[in-house]
Amino acid sequence: MSLLSIFGCGRAKTPEYPADRLSARDGTEFTITFFKHASLAISVGGKYIYVDPVSANADYGALPKADVVLITHSHYDHLDVAAVEKLLAADTEILCDRTSAEAFEMNCYTMRPGSVATPRDYVKVEAVAAYNTTPGHLQFHPREREDCGYVLTIGGTRIYIAGDTEPTPELKAL
């Protein structure tokens, strides 16, 4: 028996993460893959949208390149520039909140609550307010920071990405 047969072929296997395969209202199929904490990916027809990529949550160098990257806010557990850089292709679109935009030395589209963007023909992105309302948490996500959650529309189906937020009046409108 050779060492290769005992230990495999010598290549690391890409880790598998929990994923849900869904169909949008118009029949478009998409998959939501959860990595950890706030990091996830949505794949639509071989295109990938990554949300809050953080290196501690996934091996982004082993994953497909991003079509779109969404960043909700600049805290370390939601924004990791090194992870984003591993996902970049020549035409990757990065959408992020105002404070995260300051962390990038690359082009990104700054989103504020109320902003709407269509970075690709298969997805519309609406930025919604994400802030804390309870006294013990106000210092982490004050409303004036303009942190973002996102509502993605894919094939007529809306997907809410919360970011870090608590119940707010804006959530009732969703």
PLM-predicted stretches and their roles:
Residues 81-82, 106, 137-138:
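Short, conserved acidic/polar surface loops in the N-terminal third of protein domains
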Residues 3, 7, 12-64, 110-173:
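Core dinuclear metal-dependent hydrolase active-site scaffold
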Residues 85-86, 90-94, 98-126:
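Non-globular, low-confidence helical/coil segments that flank catalytic cores
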Residues 95, 99-102, 166-174:
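Cap/insert and terminal regions of metallo-dependent hydrolase folds
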Residues 55-100:
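Active-site metal-binding motif and surrounding structural segment of the metallo-beta-lactamase
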